[in-house]
Design a protein with these regions (language model features):
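Polybasic, glycine- and aromatic-enriched phosphate-binding surface used to engage nucleic acids
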Residues: 1-105
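Non-catalytic DNA-recognition/assembly elements of restriction-modification systems
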Residues: 97-154
Length: 154
């Protein structure tokens, strides 16, 4: 770490290497009010696509992706944590509610279907209009599940 802070001097230094090549989830730094998160395969990460990693095997990364992709969590972050268009690592103080096994299964079904639809979109296997229509319905279902999970009435 002799080169830390010395611009133009020394070699490259590695940061947070304990997180290299781990699966996690990420989002783009600049967002609208509604955050869109996704799973991230093994790799090395940078600030353009912020990444987090679950510390508990009881809470799968895809579940946190579901929560972050919900309107409730986006609005919670916008109203109580950070009202800018940047959702950053330090903003990750979102209350994560532990789901029951039944709830976890329901979230997994939504996540799996949305993932399959996005794969079909990228492979041009299905009409994009049909895909977006089904994704909109899944978003509504996800939002309803998250509101119910947090015991919020609209």
């Amino acid at each position: 770490k002799d080169n830390a802070g010395k611009k133009g001097k020394g070699g490259t230094r590695y940061q947070n290497s304990q997180f290299y090549f781990r699966n996690g989830f990420c989002w783009t730094d600049v967002n609208t009010t509604y955050i869109k998160s996704r799973l991230k395969e093994n790799g090395v990460y940078d600030v353009l696509s912020m990444s987090l990693f679950s510390l508990s095997h009881k809470i799968p990364d895809w579940y946190i992706v579901c929560l972050l992709n919900s309107k409730y969590i986006s609005e919670y972050i916008d109203n109580f944590i950070n009202s800018t268009q940047h959702f950053q690592i330090n903003d990750a103080i979102v209350p994560i509610k532990i789901p029951t096994e039944k709830e976890l299964k329901e979230f997994n079904e939504i996540f799996s279907r949305a993932t399959e639809l996005k794969k079909q979109e990228f492979k041009n296997e299905k009409n994009k209009g049909e895909i977006y229509e089904e994704l909109d319905k899944l978003q509504d279902k996800l939002d309803s599940k998250v509101y119910s999970l947090y015991e919020i009435t609209k």
